[in-house]
Amino acid sequence: MRLSAIGLYFSALAVGLVASLPQHHDIHPRPNIKPAPFDAGKALPYSPPRHPKRRCFVRPGADATRDDARVIYHAFKECNNGGTIILDQTYLISSPLDLTFLRHIDVVLTGEIHFDDSDVYYWAENSFKFNFQNQSVFWKWGGEDVNIYGDLSKEGSVIDGRGQRYWKEIETNKSLLRPMLFAFDGMKGATMSNLRMRNTPNWFNIIANSTDILISNMDLRVESLDGVKIANSDGWDTYRSDRVVIQDSVVLNTDDCVSFKPNSTNIVVQNLDCTGSHGISVGSLGQYANETDIVENLYIYNVSLANSSDGARIKVWPGIQTSFQALLNGGGGLGRVKNVTYDLFRNVNNDRAITITQCYGQKNQTLCYEHPVSVPLPMKPKSKARTHTQQANLTIEDITIKNMYGTTSESLDPQAGTLICSAPDRCSNIRAENITVRVPSGKEPLYACKNVDERLLGFDCTLPAGDRDVGQG
């Protein structure tokens, strides 16, 4: 239900009254979280204490079909620039909410946020759109100096996307646009901690066009009823963002636990426990022809992956357009993956411990190798070699995977991983050190390799029968 103009007026007035009245109870204090043991290369900007008398306690509506979006919006407007928002009740958001104007504000979420699922096609039309992989979001947060936190020692502190109806609908309409649960978009200097996220229709989080972000002590889970398949439930995706730390969190999902999308730099992921995922993934990259994707300076430390398709994973589209899924196709992009380290990585029943592919989404491996993550560009006008083309590459270089242990699943036993590059000059300095992953049969683990320097790997390679990484998201 969308609020009328009169309803909006009284909702806004109610927030003002609540904010100005003396409060009879304390609020949960802002947690003192720090990146540890690693940071993203620069300390987070200082976030000063908020004014103790500028507090907005948000009062939800009483109607079960209400829309609390406007009430929340007016609270943020009132307590912006030095105040604190308290969301300690149960709220229903039924329309998109743009919170990209935030400055110097804390948000205490000890209640519950639910997104209205009565009409999934309403959100397909009205959610905020990203010009990347057909993504959209219920609400988006941007600005500077923002702290969002809850209290995991008690019930509540929940953001619920009510994804079940979306998952059910895409069984018959795979082109349905499903919103993500949360977006930082254009945020500078923010923390998010001690919250529960549940049942996102699509990705849980995107961190886009943002810098200096710290995510800590989060609990992300999806659960389907009646056997409906959960789709695209990435934990975090970073996109065009710099200096991000994601740490000390638990993720139970069915897609990438963390995914570094184009132009993600100086990012640390540490102390995560992921179950059911597709790995800690670089990419996919190179999806859009002639676009440059750069991912570099990543450190992934002390991560446990269980019951997943992949552990450490790098996925790059080939140098030719390919159709993959109903809303996902591409190839022919440019760029590089550089200086990525996976360190202290635990595998528990994962199909593959290591996956590197430059043929993502392409089932025809021969065709992929004929177009090795590059796109032909016209020669300069003065060039005499008019019968040839210049090659602009998407390369993978300076990758280290070390201190990896645990077990794979029985699915591909005795194979434990694949490292497949589309051409010898597209991958360089890929190293594996102290890899002690075992397979269930007790046989020697096998790794399928192509176009990588096997002298830098701490295991023996076999020739690949084919690159599996064409059917997973």
Where do the language-model regions lie?
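Extracellular/periplasmic carbohydrate-active domains that bind, remodel
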Residues: 2-473
